[in-house]
Every structure is written in structure tokens, then in C-alpha cells.
């Protein structure tokens, strides 16, 4: 079986990487206004991929790259059919400063599509945390050698790499199941969100440790990726709850949480 992206998907992924890197570099003014450049997304065709005979798998690829760049716009809400609404007469305190939060209408529930989308974005966040950790481990010198030569550092990066690749496989599987309306869509999406969002949080925590002191400060962008990862993990059903859902589906009985 061929699990590689096809030519169109690879071109779309590369286009997203290039566009996002130019619009949302790591050294951007994080504290200033965050322009979602929605009109540019429309020009790129990302707001209506169906017009190009593409589907949710391609949207998931875009979300992965948006997670990597910490894109500030509501693309996830757009592709999952979620509606942003303001709470009446209240203030919503945000944790992830790169993404304002909104209240969901009463009765809103996570769909497999939403879970798969969040998993895809989490993969991008985890990959960026890993890449930042690798870059620092290669260039930061300690006792005359790059810190990446020490097992305490290199093994953390190796573990993160394994987690990211597993998360990506689950996210792509979930995206395909949702796109094809496969009977395993609910199970795949639950598994993907549980593993990928947790992997993103752990990837950020490990990368912060690899960076040492600077990783714990607001001077470095890592804390923003960490907050996005925590947001993805904590929105809706958490990994522990998703595991109960998965066990229920596998065993056909209600599992005690």
C-alpha cells in the first residue's frame, strides 16, 4: 500500500509551507495585531478546496502547516463548520494568545471532523516543537560539544520524533476516514485527537527542557506553541475521556472512567 501524499497534495503542502513561513515567521511581532489574511486564503483557494476537486484530507494538510506556523485565523472553525459566537455580556479570558477563544452554542458537540482537524493541527505544533529542539541541540554548545551529543538531550528528541510520526499517521488516517465517510471515522478521529494533542503537549515540554533557561521565558516563541498544544488538548474531550470512548467502541460495553 502507498501511504505517500500524491503530487497535488505534496504541492499543496509545499505551497502552504512557503506562504505561511513568509506571512508568519517565528520572529514576527507576537504582541501586535495578528492579521489572519483571510482574503489571501480565498485567493489561494483554501477556503473552498472542493472547487479544485479536493477534500478534507487536503484541508487537514493545510491545518497541519497552520499548526506549524501558529496561524492565528479561524481556519479550523471554517473547515469544521463551527460557528464563532460571542458570549453575551461577558469577557472571555484567553490562554492561547495566538488564538482568541469564543463560546460554542449550547448543545454543540465534537464531531469526527472537528477531532480529526484538531489532530492535524496538533501534528504541526508538535513538529515545530521538535524542529526547534533539534536546531537548538545542534547549535548550543556545552563543554565544547553540541548539547545534542548528550543522551539526556538526544533521547528526548528521538522520543519526540517517534511520537510525531505516530501522531501524523493517526491524523492522516482520521482525515481519510472522515473524507470517505468511513465507518471507522469516529474511532479514528478519537484516537487521532487523543494521541496527537497529547503528543503536541509533550513535544513542547521536551523542547522547552532541551532549550534550558531560554525555553522557560517569554522571549522565546516556544511558550506560544505550548499554549496552542494545551488548547488543542483541552478543547472538548480530553485524551483520557477519548480513551474511554475508544474502549467503549472496541469492547461494546460501557467502560468506567
Give the positions of each predicted feature.
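Glycine-rich, Trp-frequent "lid" loop and neighboring beta-strands that shape
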Residues: 52, 61, 68-109
Amino acid at each position: 500500500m502507498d501511504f505517500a501524499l500524491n503530487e497535488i497534495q505534496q504541492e499543496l503542502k509545499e505551497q502552504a509551507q512557503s506562504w505561511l513561513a513568509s506571512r508568519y515567521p517565528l520572529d514576527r511581532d507576537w504582541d501586535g495585531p495578528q492579521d489572519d489574511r483571510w482574503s489571501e486564503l480565498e485567493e489561494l483557494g483554501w477556503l473552498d478546496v472542493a472547487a479544485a476537486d479536493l477534500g478534507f484530507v487536503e484541508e487537514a494538510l493545510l491545518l497541519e502547516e497552520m499548526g506549524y506556523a501558529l496561524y492565528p485565523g479561524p481556519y479550523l472553525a471554517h473547515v469544521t463548520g463551527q460557528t464563532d459566537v460571542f458570549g453575551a455580556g461577558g469577557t472571555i479570558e484567553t490562554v492561547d494568545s495566538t488564538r482568541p477563544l469564543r463560546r460554542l452554542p449550547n448543545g454543540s458537540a465534537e464531531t469526527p471532523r472537528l477531532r480529526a482537524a484538531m489532530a492535524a493541527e496538533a501534528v504541526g505544533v508538535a513538529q515545530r516543537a521538535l524542529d526547534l529542539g533539534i536546531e537548538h541541540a545542534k547549535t548550543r554548545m556545552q563543554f565544547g560539544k553540541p548539547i545534542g551529543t548528550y543522551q539526556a538531550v538526544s533521547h528526548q528528541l528521538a522520543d519526540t520524533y517517534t511520537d510525531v510520526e505516530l501522531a501524523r499517521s493517526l491524523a492522516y488516517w482520521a482525515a481519510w476516514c472522515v473524507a470517505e465517510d468511513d465507518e471507522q471515522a469516529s474511532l479514528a478521529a478519537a484516537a487521532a485527537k487523543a494521541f496527537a494533542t497529547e503528543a503536541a503537549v509533550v513535544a513542547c515540554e521536551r523542547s522547552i527542557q532541551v532549550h534550558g533557561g531560554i525555553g522557560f521565558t517569554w522571549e522565546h516563541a516556544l511558550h506560544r506553541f505550548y499554549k496552542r498544544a494545551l488548547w488543542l488538548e483541552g478543547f472538548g474531550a480530553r485524551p483520557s475521556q477519548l480513551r474511554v470512548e475508544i474502549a467503549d467502541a472496541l469492547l461494546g460495553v460501557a467502560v468506567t472512567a
